[in-house]
Curated annotation (Swiss-Prot):
GO terms for biological process: cell adhesion involved in single-species biofilm formation; negative regulation of invasive growth in response to glucose limitation; negative regulation of pseudohyphal growth; negative regulation of transcription by RNA polymerase II; regulation of transcription by RNA polymerase II. GO terms for molecular function: DNA-binding transcription factor activity, RNA polymerase II-specific; RNA polymerase II cis-regulatory region sequence-specific DNA binding; sequence-specific DNA binding; zinc ion binding. SUPFAM superfamilies: beta-beta-alpha zinc fingers. Transcriptional repressor. InterPro entries: Znf_C2H2_sf (IPR036236), Znf_C2H2_type (IPR013087). A zinc finger (C2H2-type) spans 153-175, 181-205. This is Probable transcriptional regulator NRG2.
Length: 220
């Protein structure tokens, strides 16, 4: 069914209780559509009520008009249901000066969910909006403070920080040039400032011995 001429018509659709009314703007003539309560079915098990034309009367309504009706009905009922939960809380917070009317949900932590038609609350309808608390900020600052306390030992030459005095003394050998650790291999005599570096160097001699021994076995 095509809509012939354009006319801004404010129609009223009665909900199930026949008390809630809302305007819908669409382009059609009043004679082309008749809105009756029995033309629409209500789904009480869903969180939001939507107006769905029944099969016996759906041929009377154009497809474009069906989309407009369902969209307006969804927006109306969703806005009404949201206002039931948030109007009281927002008005109290606005009156006390804790929040601004522009951002009413800025300081709201939890909004209780309304019961749906089957008597169970929707677990996804609760809203949690919170700012970082003082406890979290304290923990972060404590972590940085403890990290600063760990580096208590500083080099007097390059100002590098270390956690223990042993690490600092080991670092000072770089500046002084001390090499107290000598390679125990015969004929090597190479000196190192760190013991682990000396051990690592000594393993190279042991690996050379193993390689030479394997070559001798292979040749024999």
């Amino acid at each position: 069914m095509s809509i012939g001429y354009k006319d801004n018509l404010m129609s009223t659709i009665l909900a199930k209780d026949r008390k809630c009314e809302f305007p819908i703007n669409f382009e059609c003539s009043p004679s082309q559509i008749t809105l009756m309560p029995e033309m629409f079915s209500f789904n009480n098990e869903r969180k939001y009520q939507t107006l769905i034309p029944l099969m016996k009367t759906s041929h009377l309504i154009d497809d474009d008009l069906k989309d407009k009706l369902n969209k307006c009905a969804f927006d109306f009922f969703s806005g009404k249901q949201a206002n039931r939960t948030s109007d009281g809380t927002i008005s109290r917070l606005t009156a006390s000066g804790k929040t601004s009317p522009i951002l009413p949900l800025q300081n709201i932590n939890i909004v209780k969910a309304e019961n749906t038609g089957n008597g169970k609350s929707d677990p996804y309808s609760s809203i949690k909006i919170s700012k970082p608390t003082k406890t979290v900020i304290k923990l972060k600052s404590t972590k940085t403070n403890t990290a600063g306390q760990r580096t208590r030992h500083f080099c007097k030459i390059c100002s590098t920080g270390f956690t223990t005095s042993g690490h600092l003394s080991r670092h000072n050998r770089i500046h002084t040039g001390e090499k107290n650790h000598i390679c125990p291999h015969e004929g090597c005599g190479q000196r190192f400032s760190r013991h682990d570096n000396c051990n690592q160097h000594y393993r190279t001699h042991a690996n050379k011995k193993k390689r030479n021994w394997k070559r001798r076995e292979a040749s024999s």
